[in-house]
Structure formats: structure tokens, C-alpha cells
Amino acid sequence: MVKVSILRLLTSCLLIVSSAAMCKPASDWFSNFKNDATPEQLYHFLYMLPKGGDLHNHLGGSNFSEWWYELAIQPERNGGYRYYTRTVINLCNGYGTNEFNSAPQSLMFRTIQHSNYNTLSECEKSEYRLMNELNLEQKTAWLNSIRLNKDFEGRSEFFEKHWSRLNDLGRNPIIAAEMIVKNMQAFAEEGLTYLETQISAFNRLKSDGSVYSGNEVIDLFRQRLTQYDAIDTGVTTRLQQSLLRFSPDAEENLKRNYRLADSN
């Protein structure tokens, strides 16, 4: 079996590591293995290796569609927000609009909160439907719109469409706090004991459309993570303040991040 053969390879090197003449340097045997192994062998080998610091977790991209929907339609759990999503396209702004920004008018299932819905024109409002009023077909399509469930979907769909569709949902810190706990619960079932995830405390929207301060968001996270169901998971969780390194104001944001981390 592939798994057994790889374990034997690792064990044999570990047992005789004291004898350099009997065990080739790691760089040699790994290079040979990498060049000669089948894709299946490489997959199993990397799957079994302990994972290092190069791996990281983005909270915003770690949540199931069902979790997003569940929280979107429950104001009593999401902080009193109501969400609308685009179910039809009426080209309210005509032809020739910028379809490469974060809010293209041709993007189905772009989700907005009620404060932003109220700023739309009547034509634009006609494209959107309250999320808890979606019919079964629309709900299923919305759930699938933030899954990679088709053969032609991949990296571009994930990075260029999913985030734009989630939109205001991803800016609600109360939903974000619930998602942290949902991840802790799900990972606990798989035996995980430590979770370190990236999330930004900045640019989070209140239900009236105003913006939370970073410290206000961190306080919301603290309050949620001290509740019994979070503690009961047994998962130690730490949060990293994320930074988009290629944004025009990356250096200023980095300074802001350090100030926030220092004060907390």
C-alpha cells in the first residue's frame, strides 16, 4: 500500500539517522521521491506530514453556505440585520458599466443589508429579494452560488465571485463571531484542539450602515467567545488581524493593525 510504503521510508530514515552513511540527506531522498513518485503517492505523503506555518486559515472563506444562509435570515441572531440578494438582472444602469469591480451589475446573488438596500433606485430594488422570502429554487441557487459545485468553477470563481456575492454578510461582526464558534464546533468534532484564523476587525458595518471601530469589533468577538458553547468545544482559538498586502494603503493599514494589536 502507498501509505505503508511511505511510512516505512520515513521510519527507516528515522531509525538510522545517526549514521549519515546509511541514510541519505533529506534533500537527496526527498528530491528523488518527488521526482519518481506518482501523483497519488505525493498526495498521500503530503497528507500525512505535519503541517507547518505556511498554512493559514481565512475565516471568511471557511464557512458553509448553509451557515451563511441560516444567519442571514435570523435577525435575532445576526444583530438585527435584514439581508437582500439579487435574483434578477434588469440592467438598471444600462450598458457599458464596469463589470470588473467588486459590485458588477451583472452579478447574481450579490447580498446587501437593509441600510444599503434603502439607497438603491426603484429599478435596482426590483432586482433584489429579502433573503427569508426566497423560494426553494432561489434558495438553492443562492446556496450553490458560494460553492464550487461545477466542473468549470475554480480559483477565479472563488476569489472573484464568492466574496462579491457575500458582500455585506461578510462585514457583519456578529455573524463573524458566530462563524468563529461554528468553526470551533466543527473542528472539535474532527479532533482539532487549536485554531488560529485570519479576520479583520476593520470596515465592519453596523445595521444602520455606519462603521464599527476595530476595538468595538474585538469586544464583540470577546463576548461571543466567552459563552459556554464556545468554551465547551475545547478548541483554543486565536485571531490574526489580516492585511491585504497589495492594497494601495497597505503600509498605513499595517501601522493601524499594529496599534490595534498593541491595545488588545
Predicted regions and their residues:
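Hydrophobic helical h-region of N-terminal Sec-dependent signal peptides
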Residues: T11-L15
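N-terminal signal peptide c-region/cleavage motif recognized by signal peptidases
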Residues: I16-A20
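Metal-cofactor-binding active-site regions of metalloenzymes
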Residues: C23-N264
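Bacterial N-terminal signal peptides that target proteins for export
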Residues: M1-L10
